[in-house]
Amino acid sequence: SRAVADSWMDEVIKLCGRELVRAQIAICGMSTWSKRSLSQEDAPQTPRPVAEIVPSFINKDTETIIIMLEFIANLPPELKAALSERQPSLPEPQQYVPALKDSNLSFEEFKKLIRNRQSEAADSNPSELKYLGLDTHSQKKRQPYVALFEKCCLIGCTKRSLANYC
């Protein structure tokens, strides 16, 4: 059965888009099961502690979520509103109109004040993507996947090469 699994994994496929993603999911599911069955043949079945049953990625995801929640809790209110409502982090100039009517500022001074605040906010606040951890680090992590997916689509790749990314 092991030789059949090896020949199946060395089979070359040429898929693109959704079909490639479906194949990746199927291969990852099958390679996980085959790894489990091979390890069960080699080692006797012993009960594992509950902590080992929970996959490590869940613990890492939990840590990441906690860090993000703490970070978001410390954000200025304007940025919290931008993250939750997907609105610009700065108020629109129309919201300043009542304040302008009650003040002695000229319209030109008022426009200058708004521009200064917008440029200060742009300089001091990183983009929304950085707050969510989706900056260049995540893009670099995706680059090998993109290269492999392009190869699988244009030339073809083995199921084993897809299984390496499970």
Swiss-Prot record:
GO terms for cellular component: extracellular region. It is found in: Secreted. The keyword Aminoacyl-tRNA synthetase does not apply. GO terms for molecular function: hormone activity. Its main location: secreted. SUPFAM superfamilies: Insulin-like. It comes from the Eukaryota. Residues 37-139 form a propeptide. Residues 1-5 form the signal peptide. Keywords: Cleavage on pair of basic residues, Disulfide bond, Hormone, Secreted, Signal. Expressed in the corpus luteum of pregnancy but not in the placenta. Disulfide bonds join 16-153, 28-166, 152-157. InterPro entries: Insulin-like, Insulin-like_sf, Insulin_CS, Insulin_family, Relaxin, Repro_Hormone_Insulin-like. Relaxin is an ovarian hormone that acts with estrogen to produce dilatation of the birth canal in many mammals. May be involved in remodeling of connective tissues during pregnancy, promoting growth of pubic ligaments and ripening of the cervix. PANTHER family: PRORELAXIN H1 (PTHR12004:SF14), RELAXIN (PTHR12004). Belongs to the insulin family. Heterodimer of a B chain and an A chain linked by two disulfide bonds. This is Prorelaxin H1. It comes from Pan troglodytes. The lineage of its organism: Eukaryota, Metazoa, Chordata, Craniata, Vertebrata. The gene is RNL1.
